[in-house]
A protein has these predicted regions:
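Helix-adjacent hinge/juxtasegments
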Residues: 28-53
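Amphipathic coiled-coil/heptad-repeat helices and related helical stalk/stem segments
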Residues: 14, 40-44, 74-75, 113-114
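Catalytic-site beta-strand/loop segments enriched in glycine and acidic/polar residues
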Residues: 48-79
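Hydrophobic/aromatic ligand-binding patch that stacks against planar heteroaromatic rings
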Residues: 21, 49, 80-84
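A cross-family acyltransferase "interaction/gating" segment
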Residues: 67-140
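Catalytic core of membrane glycerolipid acyltransferases/transacylases, capturing the structured
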Residues: 1-37
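Cofactor-binding loop segments of dinucleotide-utilizing enzymes, especially the Rossmann-like FAD-
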Residues: 9, 62, 94-97
Length: 157
């Protein structure tokens, strides 16, 4: 078994106490190009080095948590990674995340502290990870991968 290295937003990566856990897990912090282009480039370099060593790297090609639980359009970062290192890509999807403690709250910036808490909308959410066959990294595009992930989730095309 090989551990998976997750690419994650640097502000989450840098949460006190959690940072130690993320560093120990060898997570890769990333920022948007407008926010911190140097950190973004370092993240792409670290992803490339990890893939060159045969490590598994997990990215969320949308670039952020969605506000409504639906898939947002995939960004081109996956294509940038594959242009440097065309490794096989295993499309994966999470089902039933919306309403769990990991979803955003629609009113997170307004209302009381209770409104802003990440209290699950349903108890014991049954989250599923579904996996498709690998896609050749030399031919994979953000559009193709997004379509595969949508199909895994059962989203209409």
């Amino acid at each position: 078994p090989r551990p998976v290295r997750f690419v994650m937003y640097y502000r989450i990566f840098n949460i006190p106490v959690m940072r130690w856990i993320f560093k120990t897990a060898k997570a890769i912090p990333i920022a948007g190009a407008k926010e911190d282009p140097a950190l973004m480039q370092r993240a792409f370099d670290e992803v490339d080095a990890a893939l060159a060593e045969g490590e598994l790297v997990c990215i969320f090609p949308e670039g952020a948590l969605t506000k409504d639980g639906n898939i947002a359009p995939f960004k081109s970062g996956v294509e940038k990674i594959l242009a440097r290192r065309p490794v096989p890509v295993v499309p994966m999807a999470l089902r039933n995340m919306w309403g769990s403690m990991w979803s955003r709250r629609a009113n997170a910036k307004a209302g009381s502290a209770l409104d802003r808490m990440r209290v699950p909308r349903r108890l014991r959410a049954h989250v599923e990870v579904v996996v498709a066959e690998p896609v050749d990294g030399a031919t994979a595009t953000a559009e193709l991968l997004e379509a595969r992930v949508r199909a895994l989730r059962g989203d209409a095309a």
